């Protein structure tokens, strides 16, 4: 394992590297969270779609596999969000990752319990509101990210420096990041850490069908399409199903996406041509399926290598 880094995010989350796993419904559960944390990153259990009993089970699984810190993502708009938070508090989770709504209504309970909280945003307005609510950091998601994204259309390269200049709290970059160069670029823009999602899907341990992983690594950066921009935009790989939905108006596309249900279950029962496969534009940079620890160590090693190369250029050397 690479030598641990130390900055505001690693200290806040208690991890070795400032790399957190993007929460993915029914995919990043207890086992995946533990694997990421054991590899030096910060694993996150996605509570979306889990009952109280399910979440308790996944927390126990994670704790049986790692002694390292991990967090739980709670989409605020979900009807059982308060219940999920209650489980996290009762079971001693130290970091809650809120998204899809304002965290303000939960902040009193979170702070009383002594939890740390990070919140996902995709715009300046959302970030300022999250900071005012009292979150400890924000995950800023650029438009090139996979899965459900913001409607603002602002890319990571533009969103991150704008938020860094405007906020007092740390910013974690999300969207278009999957290697050491992306990690270093995010840090150069002022982020204190990164979130990875699509790159995590393309790991040996990720519990999605192999055709999903193969489709990602065989794709170019322009192989994705954004569906349902009105209410719940989602970036996915192009195939027969997405081509049909892309021809609908936004409202109809939103209904069609909702009717598909969870992406993992669709993939389990479908094929590369018929499954809805959330995927970011970073797919064009992912060369193959690797273990999680190799992905993370490669990002850290790669970032250091790029930094050394840039150092020689800045100091007057040749690239």
Q: What residues fall within each predicted segment?
A:
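Conserved active-site-proximal phosphate/metal-binding subdomains
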Residues: 150-172, 178-319
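Active-site entrance/lid segments in N-terminal catalytic domains of soluble metabolic enzymes
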Residues: 1-166, 170
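Active-site metal-binding loops of divalent metal-dependent hydrolases
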Residues: 24, 176-177
């Amino acid at each position: 394992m690479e030598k641990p880094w130390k900055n505001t995010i690693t200290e806040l989350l208690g991890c070795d590297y400032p790399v957190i796993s993007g929460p993915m419904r029914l995919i990043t559960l207890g086992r995946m969270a533990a694997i990421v944390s054991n590899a030096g990153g910060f694993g996150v259990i996605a509570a979306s779609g889990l009952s109280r009993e399910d979440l308790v089970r996944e927390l126990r699984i994670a704790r049986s596999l790692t002694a390292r810190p991990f967090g739980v993502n709670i989409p605020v708009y979900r009807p059982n969000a308060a219940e999920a938070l209650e489980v996290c508090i009762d079971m001693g989770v130290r970091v809650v990752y809120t998204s899809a709504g304002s965290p303000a209504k939960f902040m009193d309970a979170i702070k009383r319990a002594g939890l740390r909280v990070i919140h996902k945003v995709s715009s300046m307005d959302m970030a300022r509101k999250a900071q005012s609510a009292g979150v400890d950091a924000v995950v800023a998601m650029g438009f090139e990210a996979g899965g459900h994204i913001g409607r603002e259309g602002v890319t990571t390269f533009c969103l991150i420096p704008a938020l860094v200049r405007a906020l007092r709290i740390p910013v974690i970059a999300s969207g278009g990041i999957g290697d050491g160069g992306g990690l270093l670029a995010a840090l150069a823009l002022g982020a204190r850490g990164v979130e990875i999602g699509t790159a995590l899907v393309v790991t040996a341990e990720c519990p999605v069908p192999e055709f999903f992983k193969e489709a990602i690594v065989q794709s170019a950066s322009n192989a994705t399409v954004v569906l349902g921009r009105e209410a719940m935009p989602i970036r996915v790989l192009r195939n027969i199903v997405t081509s049909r939905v892309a021809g609908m108006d936004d409202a109809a596309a939103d209904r069609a996406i909702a009717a598909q249900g969870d992406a993992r279950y669709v993939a389990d029962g479908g094929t590369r041509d018929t499954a809805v496969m959330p995927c970011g534009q970073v797919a064009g940079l992912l060369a193959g399926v690797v273990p999680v620890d190799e992905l993370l160590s490669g990002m850290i090693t790669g970032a250091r290598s790029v930094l050394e190369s840039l150092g020689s250029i800045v100091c007057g050397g040749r690239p």
